[in-house]
């Protein structure tokens, strides 16, 4: 079982069949002194079942590019995930980075980009 609680970065789970499940993070910033209340993050308990898990910063979806020179957006990012058709973490991250480079074209990178893809080992019995 994987326990996840996030702030501003959703966790995505990708099955061996390529199905994507989103576990939403709280829309809450971390580490700012002016925040009075501590984060009350919702916890998700997720069966591992051979899934690949993915965390990605918003620098991907906010990247300008494409023929229309618009932000990539979450719909296009979801399409890249569907095109990848893999639950192998390395292949998935490489596929997403290729898709980002194609989308970006000659545009400048607007923000930092981080993709973390991992597959936990099956639980020992």
List PLM regions with ranges.
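Conserved subregion of the PPM/PP2C metallophosphatase catalytic domain
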Residues: 1-125
């Amino acid at each position: 079982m994987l326990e996840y609680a996030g702030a501003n970065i959703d966790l995505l789970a990708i099955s061996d069949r390529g199905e994507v499940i989103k576990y939403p993070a709280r829309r809450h910033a971390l580490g700012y002194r002016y925040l009075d209340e501590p984060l009350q993050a919702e916890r998700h308990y997720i069966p591992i079942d051979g899934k690949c898990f993915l965390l990605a910063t918003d620098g991907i979806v906010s990247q300008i590019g494409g023929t229309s020179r618009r932000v990539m957006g979450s719909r296009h990012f979801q399409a890249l995930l569907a095109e990848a058709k893999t639950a192998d973490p390395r292949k998935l991250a490489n596929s997403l980075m290729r898709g980002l480079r194609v989308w970006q074209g000659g545009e400048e990178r607007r923000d930092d980009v981080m993709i973390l893809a991992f597959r936990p080992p099956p639980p020992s019995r």
